[in-house]
Structure formats: C-alpha cells, structure tokens
Regions:
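Bacterial signal peptide processing site
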Residues: 20-22
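Sec-dependent N-terminal signal peptides
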Residues: 6-13
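Long, charged/polar, surface-exposed segments that mediate recognition or autoinhibition
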Residues: 119-130
Length: 183
C-alpha cells in the first residue's frame, strides 16, 4: 500500500511540475502578431549611443526631457506608453526587410533604421528596393545583415525612455518617428 501511494505521489508531482509558470520568462513570445516583424531577439533598451554623423534636430516638436505618448506598436507594450524624450535627430528613416546573420526567418518591414545605420549610404536618401548592409544592432543578427529598403522618409526621429504597458522599463529605445508621438 505504501509503495502504491509513493508511486502515485511521484506521478502526481511529475505531472504537476509541468503546470508551473516561470514568471521571470522575458522572451518576446508574448508580443503577439505585430505586422510581419519578428521581434525575437529585440534589444528593448539601448546604450544611448547614436550612430556617427547623426545630426541633433535643430527644432524638434518634442524637446529632450519632454513627455509624449507613443502611438506605434514596434514592440509589445509600446502603443499607448508614456515616453520621455532622450534625443531628437533629423535624418532619413527607413523600414527594411532583412534575413538575420544568425539565421532564422526573414524580418519584414522593420521600423526604424536611420541613414547613419547603413553601411556606405552616403548622405542622400536611398530609394525603396535598394539593397543595403545594416550597421545597427536593434535586434540579434541585424548588424552586418543584407537588407532591402521597404520605405524611406525624411523625418525627426527620437530616442525615448518609456515604461511599457506591461510594466517593463525601456531605456534609450531607438527609434520612434515624430508622427508616432502625441502630446
């Protein structure tokens, strides 16, 4: 009888151990479907360093230190989050599609890469369809990846600190465009 109870208890313990929840799991599988972008490996917070040659905006709508609400869904918890402006820069900003250097699925329509994060891009805007090499590390496998420009626009881009709607604190997020912010 004791042996049967021991076996039954062991089986129950094994079965129940598969039901536990790891609350420290911070992978990006909870991000849901955000367009065709794959956000696995996304570097939510950045170092705060800006690419060489990126020019500070002369007269940005949102000044450094001011607050705005993000109206973009590059990442889970971003849309509707309150942000503090850390930097404002005038440049050409691109949405790109690329295959990570680490392998895996092609990332489509990644927003945003700035002109200064493209290898040998020069200072003139590039046209959609142009093949480029990325010098950014917003996501794993991005730096050095071959990419195709999906769209391009002259814009003021912002580096922001914000608390995601799920409570995660994000520092120095690169990049949010002026059109993706509201007061």
């Amino acid at each position: 009888m004791k042996k049967q109870l021991f076996i039954l208890g062991t089986i129950a313990a094994i079965a129940l151990s598969g039901c536990s929840t790891n609350t420290k799991d911070t992978n990006n599988s909870s991000m849901g479907n955000m367009g065709s972008m794959n956000h696995e490996g996304m570097h939510h917070s950045g170092s705060g360093q800006v690419p060489q040659g990126l020019q500070t905006a002369a007269n940005p709508k949102y000044k450094v230190g001011s607050q705005a609400t993000i109206k973009a869904d590059h990442m889970a918890g971003m849309n509707g989050a309150k942000a503090t402006i850390v930097g404002a820069y005038d440049t050409t900003v691109y949405a790109v599609s690329y295959t990570p250097t680490t392998g895996g699925e092609k990332v489509k329509n990644h927003k945003w890469i700035v002109q200064e994060e493209l290898e040998h891009a020069g200072d003139q805007p590039l046209k959609p369809g142009t093949e480029v090499t990325l010098k950014a590390d917003h996501m794993e496998g991005m730096n050095g990846a071959k990419a195709t420009i999906d769209s391009a626009e002259k814009a003021t881009v912002y580096m922001v600190d914000y608390t995601a709607t799920d409570g995660q604190k994000v520092k120095n997020h690169q990049w949010v465009t002026e059109s993706e912010l509201v007061k």
